[in-house]
């Protein structure tokens, strides 16, 4: 990969078409917990607008930490406690059993979904709840059930109700159409936020999940915008001469770390959104870019070629002398802190391939997490269990997800063209 690819702030993204992303599971986890997810009983008396059982089953399988039992292997289809023969499920090697049913109230047009999770060995109910909503909320309810089951089984909060942002490009002859889109974490229900004929790059979620910062070249030069995801209202926050790129939010949502070349060289700055004041963090002849705030807001990781090639450095958010973090290999870029701040994820070049890697900040131990070859733009799920990134598959740009601990893998290709620049949202109240 040529050196200019390191400068993702000026990268022109290759193309794709607007559509929901389609999940392709590449590899499961051998250590996944077996859970029998029984098809919910349709007690509504009419066809459901969505197969809610399929929604949360696919969510759980995609996590890599839970392995739902194949429906064809189920010996019965219980929907409530008195219909369960726990011995049968134990013989099938299942540790948990999820049952439930769906009712529909025609006058109010509201669905009521009942679910219960049981420990097969103890035969005790672990969780149980009734949730309700209209037909357009069935997918949300499915994701909510997956979140609840995942947390009950693993002890980790689920991320199935979160969202992802990404950039697509539709090519039609010599014409390019770039789109900034937001979808559910499973790639469904995509929504177009911005459509332009010039590149859009570097989307970044605000900590409350209500806004996206990004770079648009729509005025023939890069400028940084902040856009409200729900209303579409947007504000241009920087448009200096030269580069305006790589925005990333501070944990409290009041600042953006950005890369600007307004003074002649690409340096890191902190923009205070409350008063539009700028503070310069770096001052070096090299290119400093791709900042990432630590969860406590005290440290910023960034990419710099001040050592002769792209490497990861750390600098105090209040300023000071940067210190080099990566030494293994000639190319390390696009750092992202783990949720607990103990690791940094980044793109590492080894044996001609560009892979997502992790570096333990205490031990200094690094680990390659992916086996694809042209990985870019890692973004961490808010529970820290998965990383979404951009890569190539069969000559197309796709999004891919890898389980940090489970090693599970799946891809999210667009139905047409390419997709790039993923950003996983924080937890969102909806």
Curated annotation (Swiss-Prot):
Gene3D superfamilies in UniProt: TolB, C-terminal domain, TolB, N-terminal domain
Organism from which the protein derives: Hahella chejuensis (strain KCTC 2396)
Listed InterPro entries: 6-blade_b-propeller_TolB-like, PD40, Tol-Pal_TolB, TolB_N
GO CC terms of this entry: periplasmic space
Entry's localization field: Periplasm
UniProt keyword Signal present: yes
Keyword Magnesium: no
One GO biological process term: cell division
Oligomer status and interactors: The Tol-Pal system is composed of five core proteins: the inner membrane proteins TolA, TolQ and TolR, the periplasmic protein TolB and the outer membrane protein Pal. They form a network linking the inner and outer membranes and the peptidoglycan layer.
Name under which the protein is recorded: Tol-Pal system protein TolB
Secretion signal span: 1-19
Entry keyword set: Cell cycle, Cell division, Periplasm, Signal
Function statement: Part of the Tol-Pal system, which plays a role in outer membrane invagination during cell division and is important for maintaining outer membrane integrity.
Pfam families the UniProt entry points to: PD40, TolB_N
Family to which this protein belongs: Belongs to the TolB family.
Record-linked SUPFAM superfamilies: TolB, N-terminal domain (SSF52964), Tricorn protease N-terminal domain (SSF69304)
């Amino acid at each position: 990969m040529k050196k200019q690819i390191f400068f993702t702030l000026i990268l022109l993204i290759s193309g794709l078409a607007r559509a929901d992303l389609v999940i392709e599971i590449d590899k499961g986890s051998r250590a996944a917990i077996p859970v029998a997810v029984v098809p919910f009983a349709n007690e509504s008396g009419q066809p459901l607008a969505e197969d809610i059982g399929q929604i949360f089953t696919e969510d759980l399988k995609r996590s890599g930490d839970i392995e739902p039992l194949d429906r064809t292997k189920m010996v019965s289809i219980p929907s409530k406690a008195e219909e369960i023969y726990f011995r049968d499920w134990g013989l099938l090697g299942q540790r948990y059993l999820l049952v439930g049913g769906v009712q529909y109230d025609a006058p109010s047009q509201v669905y009521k979904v009942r679910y219960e999770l049981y420990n097969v060995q103890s035969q005790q109910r672990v969780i149980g709840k009734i949730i309700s909503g209209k037909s357009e909320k069935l997918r949300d309810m499915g994701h909510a059930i997956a979140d609840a089951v995942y947390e009950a089984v693993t002890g980790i909060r689920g991320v199935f109700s979160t969202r992802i942002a990404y950039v697509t490009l539709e090519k039609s002859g010599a014409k390019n159409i770039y789109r900034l889109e937001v979808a559910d974490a499973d790639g469904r229900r995509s929504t177009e936020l911005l459509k332009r004929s010039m590149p859009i790059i570097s989307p970044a979620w605000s900590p409350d999940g209500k806004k996206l910062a990004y770079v648009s070249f729509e005025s023939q030069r890069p400028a940084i915008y902040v856009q409200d995801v729900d209303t579409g209202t947007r504000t241009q926050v920087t448009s200096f001469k030269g580069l305006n790129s790589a925005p990333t939010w501070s944990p409290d949502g009041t600042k953006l770390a950005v890369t600007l070349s307004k003074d002649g060289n690409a340096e890191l700055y902190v923009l205070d959104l409350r008063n539009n004041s700028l503070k310069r963090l770096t001052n070096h002849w090299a290119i400093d870019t791709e900042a990432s705030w630590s969860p406590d807001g005290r440290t910023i990781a960034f990419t710099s070629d001040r050592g002769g090639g792209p490497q990861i450095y750390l600098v105090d958010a209040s300023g000071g002398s940067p210190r080099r973090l990566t030494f293994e290999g000639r190319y390390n870029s696009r750092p992202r802190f783990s949720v607990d701040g103990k690791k940094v994820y980044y793109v590492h070049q080894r044996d001609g391939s560009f892979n997502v890697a992790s570096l333990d900040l205490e031990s200094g131990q690094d680990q390659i997490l992916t086996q694809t070859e042209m990985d870019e733009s890692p973004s961490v799920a808010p529970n820290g269990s998965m990383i979404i990134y951009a890569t190539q598959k069969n000559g197309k740009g796709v999004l891919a997800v890898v389980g940090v601990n489970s090693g599970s893998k799946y891809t999210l290709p667009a139905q047409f063209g390419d997709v790039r620049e993923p950003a996983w949202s924080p937890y969102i109240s909806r």
